[in-house]
């Protein structure tokens, strides 16, 4: 039976040179086919999408692999079989930043998400940065409107909740949001991922990769895990 590929939950820096070592690691031993979805940025318009596609193209060129853009901007395109077919043969599927609720709601239960999940379970690496990392959990809060109910996520890592950009975000994290985020069911771990940093592996054993740290958050405080640390997250 084929083992699922690794998951990378990235705090920031997708497609930038600072995280080339991470993306190279995720592609190592896999098909050199770098599948990219800028869906989370679709509400910002075509200019934003074009920027993400250009960054992704530059990253693929530095890594010497093929860039494949999956042009999902709404649920219609997410359910298009021809669009979903672009995921086939991926070595790495990457969900970049933007709006976490929009990304999760757009992909949830669609042909494209099924294709991504199949590729991942078949051994492809699966990465989400910022909004993408949040959407890979099963609990997607609207960080700009913390009192709104969270949306269901894509549930690739249902035992985690993720706060990206944590080093920048933590200093202005509203108490009401932090209280809600750490109020989790048994077996769910809340992690803050600093910028230019990733939590890589899964589902239970992870490594901190990148420039800074990952933090485990509880009602009693936070514990730092610097780059190179191994972190265990129980699944229930």
Put a short name on every predicted segment:
Residues 1-30, 40-54, 58-61, 140-142, ...:
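C-terminal and late-domain segments of enzyme folds
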Residues 4, 29-34, 90, 123:
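A general structural motif
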Residues 9, 69-70, 94-95, 126-129, ...:
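General beta-strand structural signal in soluble alpha/beta enzymes
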Residues 12-15, 69-74, 102-106, 168-169:
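Short, flexible loop segments at the rims of nucleotide/cofactor-binding pockets, characterized by
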Residues 41-98, 102:
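Portal/gating segments that form or line small-molecule/metal binding sites
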Residues 96, 104-108, 112-171:
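Class I SAM-dependent methyltransferase SAM-binding "motif I" and its flanking Rossmann-like core
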């Amino acid at each position: 039976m084929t083992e699922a590929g690794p998951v990378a939950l990235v705090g920031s820096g997708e497609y930038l040179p600072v995280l080339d070592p991470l993306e190279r690691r995720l592609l190592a031993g896999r098909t050199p086919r770098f599948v990219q979805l800028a869906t989370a940025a679709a509400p910002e318009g075509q200019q934003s999408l074009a920027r993400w596609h250009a960054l992704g193209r530059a990253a693929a060129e530095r890594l010497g692999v093929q860039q494949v853009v999956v042009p999902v901007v709404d649920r219609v395109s997410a359910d298009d079989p021809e669009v979903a077919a672009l995921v086939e043969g991926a070595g790495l599927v990457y969900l970049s930043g933007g709006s976490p609720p929009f990304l999760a709601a757009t992909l949830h239960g669609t042909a494209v998400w099924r294709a991504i999940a199949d590729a991942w379970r078949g051994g492809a690496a699966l990465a989400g940065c910022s909004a993408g990392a949040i959407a890979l959990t099963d609990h997607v809060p609207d960080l700009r409107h913390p009192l709104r109910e969270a949306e269901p996520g894509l549930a690739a890592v249902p035992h985690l909740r993720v706060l990206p950009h944590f080093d920048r975000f933590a200093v202005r994290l509203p108490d009401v949001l932090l209280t809600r985020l750490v109020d989790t069911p048994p077996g769910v771990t809340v992690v803050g991922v600093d910028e230019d940093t990733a939590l890589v592996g899964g589902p239970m054993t992870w490594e901190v990769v990148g420039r800074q740290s990952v933090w485990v958050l509880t009602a009693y405080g936070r514990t730092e895990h610097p780059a190179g640390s191994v972190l265990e997250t129980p699944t229930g």
